[in-house]
């Protein structure tokens, strides 16, 4: 009987090599994930403002359409300026009338001021005459008992004293009248200042009737048309600030240890995953609402965890500023993937 030849033992080297390569690949993946965190829980965002008129009125011109791009200084809409133009004309007419009244009153005051100076001199003269008449009467009355003067002399002294007092009172009234005329001009001048303030305010309202874009942006949520009455401080539409786009990426708290402001980032949008955008970390969130109870602080962003039956790391929003965004691709709320490259 012929013996069967023994099979050579199979080498274990290929299997060990595969296991070793798998371990190396696993270590590399773990290192890569730890050193260059990535997340697809991200979305595009930008700053927005509510475009509100600061004056009320009917919209007579609407220069934009919904989702239209605008440049800084472009006309957005115009409110009917006629009521404000009428108020301006009325205030300017009041100012002109006041100026004429002040001019005429000033002429009268100048004349009265000249008379007031004369009246002041007359007051002093009348005061001196009244004092002299009073002194004369005081000296004359005792002499009547001695017989040095007659009763008629005393009567004349009394009459002279009364006449001097009457003259003094008359010139004092004239002086008061002149002073009141001068103060009347001051009141008109104060009234003129109030009218000038009204004119300045009306001009400001007239300027506010024309609303222009404060920055480069895009119009959204436009739901009005020409003829609509716009109320002051009520939004007409929203304007996206397209000068600066950023991505809010929610990273696990275990990924944050090497992330700093200025950390380079790569962004891909779901609308075109083959195109990448460079950016830098602007800031890292310092508070979120916990979804498993505990202290709840109003105003904090809430980031839901992906599974509830396992204790997983919380995620915090990281704000990434995009260097050169594509204005046609970037939209608020668009899904994104963010990759960070900590130094």
UniProtKB/Swiss-Prot annotation:
Per the record, the major location class is: membrane
Q: Which residues lie on this side of the membrane: Cytoplasmic?
A: 1-12
Q: Which InterPro entries does UniProt cross-reference here?
A: CusB-like_dom_1, CusB_D23, MFP_Efflux_Pump, MFP_proteobact
Q: Which keywords label this protein?
A: Antibiotic resistance, Cell inner membrane, Cell membrane, Membrane, Signal-anchor, Transmembrane, Transmembrane helix, Transport
Subcellular location(s): the record lists:
Cell inner membrane
Q: Name one GO cellular component term.
A: plasma membrane
Top-rank taxon, per record: Bacteria
- What Pfam families would the database entry show? CusB_dom_1, HlyD_D23
Q: Which sequence ranges are listed under topological domain Periplasmic? A: 34-343
Instruction: Provide the coiled-coil residue spans.
Output: none
Bilayer-crossing residues are 13-33
* Listed GO MF terms: xenobiotic transmembrane transporter activity
Biological process (GO) annotations held by this record are: response to antibiotic; xenobiotic detoxification by transmembrane export across the plasma membrane
Q: How does it sit in the membrane?
A: Single-pass type II membrane protein
What does the subunit comment say?
Could be part of a tripartite efflux system composed of MdtN, MdtO and MdtP.
Family under the similarity heading: Belongs to the membrane fusion protein (MFP) (TC 8.A.1) family.
- Function statement: Could be involved in resistance to puromycin, acriflavine and tetraphenylarsonium chloride.
Please identify the protein, giving its name as recorded: Multidrug resistance protein MdtN
Source lineage: Bacteria, Pseudomonadati, Pseudomonadota, Gammaproteobacteria, Enterobacterales
């Amino acid at each position: 009987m012929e013996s069967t030849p023994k099979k050579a033992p199979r080498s274990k080297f290929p299997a060990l090599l595969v296991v070793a390569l798998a371990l190396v690949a696993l270590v590399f993946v773990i290192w890569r994930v730890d050193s260059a965190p990535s997340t697809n829980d991200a979305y595009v965002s930008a700053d927005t403002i509510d475009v509100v008129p600061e004056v009320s009125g009917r919209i007579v011109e609407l220069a934009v359409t919904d989702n239209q791009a605008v440049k800084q200084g472009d006309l957005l809409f115009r409110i009917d300026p006629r009521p404000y133009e009428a108020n301006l004309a009325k205030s300017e007419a009041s100012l002109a009338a006041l100026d004429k009244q002040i001019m005429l009153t000033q002429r009268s005051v100048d004349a009265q001021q000249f008379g007031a100076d004369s009246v002041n001199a007359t007051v002093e003269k009348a005061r001196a005459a009244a004092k002299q008449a009073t002194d004369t009467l005081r000296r004359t009355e005792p002499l009547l008992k001695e017989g040095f003067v007659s009763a008629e002399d005393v009567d004349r002294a009394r009459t002279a004293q009364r006449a001097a007092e009457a003259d003094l009172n008359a010139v004092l009234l004239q002086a008061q009248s002149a002073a009141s005329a001068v103060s009347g001009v001051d009141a008109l001048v104060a009234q003129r200042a109030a009218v000038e303030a009204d004119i300045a305010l009306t001009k400001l309202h007239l300027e506010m009737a024309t609303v222009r874009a404060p920055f480069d942006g895009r119009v959204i949520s436009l739901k009005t048309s020409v003829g609509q009455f716009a109320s002051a401080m009520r939004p007409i539409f929203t304007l996206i600030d397209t000068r600066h786009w950023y991505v809010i990426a929610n990273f696990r708290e275990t990924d944050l240890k090497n992330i700093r402001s200025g950390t380079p980032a790569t962004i891909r949008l779901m609308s075109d995953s083959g195109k990448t955008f460079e950016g830098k970390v602007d800031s890292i969130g310092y508070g979120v609402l916990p979804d498993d109870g505990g202290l709840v602080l109003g105003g904090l962003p809430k980031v839901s965890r992906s599974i509830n039956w396992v204790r997983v790391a919380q995620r915090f929003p990281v704000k990434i500023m995009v260097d050169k965004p594509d204005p046609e691709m970037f939209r608020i709320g668009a899904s994104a993937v963010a990759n960070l490259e900590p130094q």
